[in-house]
Amino acid sequence: MTKEIQLSICIATHNRSIFLKEAISSFIPQLNDEIEIIVVDGASTDDTKLIVENFSTINNSIKYLYLNEKGGIDKDYDIALQNANGKFCWLFSDDDICKPGILDLLLKLIKQDLYSLILVNAELYNFNLDTKFKNTALNFDSDRVYDIDKQSQVNFFEDCTDYLSFIGCVVIDKKLWLSRNREKYYGTEFIHVGVIFQEFLPKKVYIISNPFIRIRLNNAQWVKRSISLWILNWPKLVWSFLNFNSNSKTKIIAKESLSQYRRLLYFRAIGLFNAKFHKEVKDLTNPSFPVNLISYIISILNIKLCNLFYRFYAKILNKPWMSIELKKYS
């Protein structure tokens, strides 16, 4: 008798076959008949199809869906979940890998039928996954459970929203996902955050504190457009959630996009923040006078000096992955 699929590992990808191969390989030894992998390919032109089909000949629980056009990360993940058979779906990144033991743990938690959402902690690694930068992305000493009462959900929002900007940590009830407005968040690149926080969750949230994901840093495809994501999309999204007050939202991100001075300095240091972009954001957000003035000054600072300053700052903060990224633009 065929067992019901409990967990679908959903991966949206585009032209990153070499990393996708590593990601899928990390799951293969842990797969059983209660788990499937769904790969949604946003019109890749590399050998993604061949690689996934080779895996599927070894294990028929690996499924491949090719899209005629790239819909963007939000839409492509949504398509993956719509085609998934599992009770829960893990929105896994195509360039990271999982560690042994996580799938058995997730199955155990899913079968308890207590949770709407499970978050998996991660380690931070370099591009080649051979040097660890940080032991845990989410600094929890032990597993946590957030209940369904309002204060618990507010605590979850304040404690975990920053980490939730990483889509690969999310394991979510598929019925919950499909019941919520998703199209609203297409183009934000944070659809999962919108789905989770647009309303309070009906069941508890479980945080796995042990890091079972290895995140490959300095490999994001969206570096050039990241300034729009972090300066415009992210604050707009966080401040759109009606169930959380201003104090809670401010703990995540300031409402005024141009008041993110450290982030603006970073983007100036890599040459993405300039007077033209400043004007675009100013026209969209109407910042206060001091915020407008300070952010404008940042937009015209010497890029090389900003880069040097921020590399020193990253060294003080012990963030070597940031230094590596900055060196590319020095």
What are these regions (language model features)?
Residues 194-197, 201, 207-330:
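C-terminal subregions of glycosyltransferases and related glycan-biosynthesis enzymes
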Residues 1-233:
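Nucleotide-sugar donor-binding/catalytic module of glycosyltransferases
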